[in-house]
A protein has these predicted regions:
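Transmembrane alpha-helices and their membrane-interface boundaries in multi-pass membrane transporters
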Residues: 1-12, 19-65, 179, 457, ...
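Hydrophobic transmembrane alpha-helices and their membrane-interface caps
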Residues: 8, 12, 30, 34, ...
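Transmembrane helices with small-residue packing motifs
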Residues: 11-20, 98-134, 188, 215-216, ...
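N-terminal membrane-entry
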Residues: 26, 373, 419-433
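Surface-exposed amphipathic alpha-helical segments in non-transmembrane regions
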Residues: 106, 110, 125, 138-164, ...
Length: 520
């Protein structure tokens, strides 16, 4: 009951953090029900079959049991003596308990914070980035060179190459591509973890003249973003017409963040000066020649891009029909002259007479976040730093270098981490629930304190263990702390219940009953 009670407050937590708590709560609740069923039904029956009168053990096994019993008796006596000393010096014991509580809370505050630890999931991604407006043929050629490096790397089982699409921006681009790299099973790789392999690949590929290629891990929780590390959106609230102002501030932020020791690999896939062709329609000529403007834009879209026509059934399948010009007829800007549009007199008018393509530069895409024009900035914590420390460093840099009309919002996994607060409130509510249940069980407001006062020592030990192992105070550690509260309360209840029964039976003082409970 106590184990289930400590997880009741987690039902009110929102977001992915709440889901993680709730899943663990369901697991604990079902386990407690199965344990209770076993204790009330199977255990008594098995005890009747398995228990035998005590007989002196003989042989090597008997000597082992005798030695173990002597050792256990000495440990028990030592524990009882410590308990007796603590009872005699109650004031000092309470001061020590208060000191351990303060130290434990202090260690908890200085522990590095993170959301969910990065794990070796058996795969990772790679991103290819060539010069802006590079052709798909150049991207394919570079991808083949990178594949040779992947084939030579130990620990990689297979890989899938997709050229012409950026995984980080989710945009189709001829000068981008990505890999899905599947690693060998964990037991076959040994010490070659995913992080080791990614670092090795990044070192081998960082100075390639053809373009940029780098490896990055997946998000800790599949489906929450496309990459690990931190992810933020810079928002332009100035109302500027173009992206130049936002781009300038994004560069300032990345430059300043790259100098922080907590951060590594800070970048953005946004480019504001990608070579483009601007197709301008001469509306005066359009009306003079009797051409419908809508037909002009529809023809450009269908032949230079693509247009969905219809679908048909054949061979038991549904086939979709798309209209698009052959690649060799849409290579150069002059190829627009090969396309025609019909005017009011049913005459075919070449598009080159009413459309002029001029070279220009501009962004390949623009993002909108909270309805504001935005740029996505990504990065990773440096080695030895947690994601919480990295996000705090980014926030400090943003406050220093960004003007008031450029704001930022966390997104994907970083958004979940930034909104994963409330662990302290959950711990407090868990303790309150345990206290109320014990107060109802013992019909006393004082006895539950003897159970609850054991939890600070347990939390102190847990925080010391996390600190000694140089781990992060993440969601899993917090779930473990809630679980620890329930386990410690359960053990304390057994001791208090036995001591209470001894005291009510008569013949023993409160101190003797407490020592009997400790010895039991």
């Amino acid at each position: 009951l106590i184990l289930a009670a400590v997880f009741i407050p987690t039902v009110f937590m929102t977001g992915i953090t709440g889901l993680l708590y709730q899943q663990f709560a369901v697991t604990i609740a079902i386990s407690v029900l199965l344990s209770a069923f076993n204790a009330l039904t199977l255990s008594p029956a098995l005890s009747a079959l398995l228990l035998r009168p005590k007989q002196p053990a003989r042989g090597p096994l008997g000597r082992f049991f005798a030695a173990f019993n002597r050792f256990f008796d000495r440990v028990t006596e030592g524990y009882v003596n410590i308990s007796r000393s603590a009872i005699k010096r109650a004031a000092r014991s309470m001061i020590l308990l208060a000191g351990l509580t303060v130290i434990g809370l202090g260690i908890g505050r200085i522990l590095p914070r993170s959301f969910v630890p990065n794990e070796d999931q058996g795969y990772f991604f790679m991103q290819l980035q060539l010069p802006d407006a590079a052709s798909l043929q150049r991207t394919d050629a570079f991808a083949l060179e990178v594949e040779k490096v992947l084939a030579e790397t130990e620990g990689i089982q297979s890989y899938t190459t997709i050229a012409g699409f950026s995984l980080l921006s989710n945009i189709s681009q001829t000068y981008a591509g990505f890999y899905f790299v599947q690693l060998e099973p964990w037991d076959e790789r040994g010490a070659r973890t995913a992080d080791v392999i990614m670092r090795e690949l990044n070192l081998r590929l960082r100075e390639r003249p053809e373009g940029l290629a780098f490896a990055f891990g997946p998000p800790s929780i599949p489906g929450v973003g496309n990459a690990g590390g931190f992810d933020m959106m810079l928002q332009d609230r100035s109302g500027a017409d173009g992206v130049e102002y936002l781009t300038e501030n994004a560069k300032r932020l990345i430059e300043a963040a790259s100098k922080r020791p907590e951060l590594t690999g800070v970048f953005t896939v946004f480019r504001a000066d990608v070579p483009q062709l601007y197709a301008g329609v001469n509306t005066d000529k359009v009306y003079k020649l009797g051409v419908n403007v809508t037909d002009v834009y529809t023809t450009l879209q269908a032949l230079l891009g693509s247009a969905y026509v219809n679908q048909f059934n054949r061979f038991g399948r549904i086939w979709k029909v798309f209209l698009q010009a052959e690649p060799e007829f849409r290579v150069k800007a002059e190829d627009i002259g090969s396309f025609y549009v019909r005017n009011e007199d049913a005459e075919m008018v070449p598009l080159s007479t009413i459309v002029k393509a001029d070279p220009s530069v501009g962004p390949a895409f623009t993002n909108r976040y909270n309805l504001f024009r935005s740029i996505e900035v990504m990065g990773s914590p440096a080695e030895g730093y947690s994601s919480g420390e990295a996000m705090a460093a980014v926030e400090e840099v943003a406050k220093e270098v960004l003007p008031a009309d450029i704001t930022f919002e966390w997104t994907n996994m970083s958004y979940q981490e930034a909104n994963a607060g409330g662990a302290g409130a959950v711990f407090a509510l868990s303790l309150i629930f345990v206290f109320l249940i014990l107060a109802g069980l013992y019909e006393s407001w004082s006895l539950p304190w003897s159970v609850l006062l054991t939890t600070p020592i347990a939390i102190f030990g847990a925080y010391v263990g996390i600190w000694a192992r140089e781990l992060d105070n993440d969601v899993f550690a917090q779930i473990g702390l809630v679980m620890l509260i329930g386990l410690i309360a359960k053990n304390a209840i057994l001791i208090v219940e036995f001591a209470k029964a001894e005291l009510e039976a008569g013949g023993k003082t409160a101190t003797e009953a407490a020592l009997a409970g400790a010895k039991s």
